[in-house]
Amino acid sequence: MHRATRTLPIALVATVLAACGSDSNGPTPGFECLGQALPTIAPPLVNVSGMVTANVLSPAPVPHAFVYAFRTGDTTHLAGDTTDTPGQYSVGIATGGTPVNGYLAISDSGHHIDTYAYPAVPLAANVTDNVLMVSSNEFSLLAASAGITPVAGGGFIGVVVRNCQGAPVAGATVTSSPAGTVRYNAGGLPSSTATSTAADGVAYIANVAPGNVTVRATASGHALREHVVNARADAITLTEIQP
């Protein structure tokens, strides 16, 4: 439910950000929207569609996964669908005329870890939201690669830092409140030594206390727009951070 098409977030994406010039007094390229007001109105119905895949090294469709849309703070789902054989889903969400602050909940009868996908900003237009799920075995391998020992009952948040155009941002640092163990990718895999995002913009916040978590990022000297997600115990929460 983000403003741009993307795959969230443990997908191994390598994107090189294009360099462009700007006036020395103007905003840093890619951060022109920093601080701009968010939309306050939305069409009566917005559609969220995409593909659910699994297997980090070779993503493949996940059929028969349950995808439900919720408004934050409300346990009644707004819309739902089941992925088809190619892993596609589509949910139409009634907005009431205002952007929807909510999330997607994705599950597939225990074959993969339950996953929750949050937008960087409230949903005010149709979007494509592709979600990559991981199995418990894959999660353990990824955690080991990052030098993390998962704590039972802890939350895990995967983040992609993007600029105003939706391109992943390299060199960003991510923090949260409450704090967790932060890691980044290097060479397309979680690293125990990387200190900022690679070209894929990916960061991980592990062993964070379950409940509401504020996620933040700094990139190119800019503090990006922070927002709150709910990190469920022993589940995966996915989100993006944008200016």
Can you say where each PLM-predicted feature lies in the sequence?
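Bacterial N-terminal signal peptides that target proteins for export
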Residues: 1-9
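C-terminal motif of bacterial Sec signal peptides marking the signal peptidase cleavage site
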Residues: 16-19
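Beta-strand-rich domain onsets/edges
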Residues: 25-47, 127-156, 165
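Structural motif
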Residues: 42-66, 160-169
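Hydrophobic beta-strand segments
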Residues: 64-72, 172-176
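Short, acidic Ser/Thr/Gly-rich low-complexity loop/linker segments typical of extracellular
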Residues: 71-94, 178-204
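Short, low-hydrophobicity acidic/polar segments
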Residues: 80, 86-149
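Structured interaction patches on ligand/partner-binding surfaces of diverse proteins
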Residues: 107-134, 208-212, 218-243
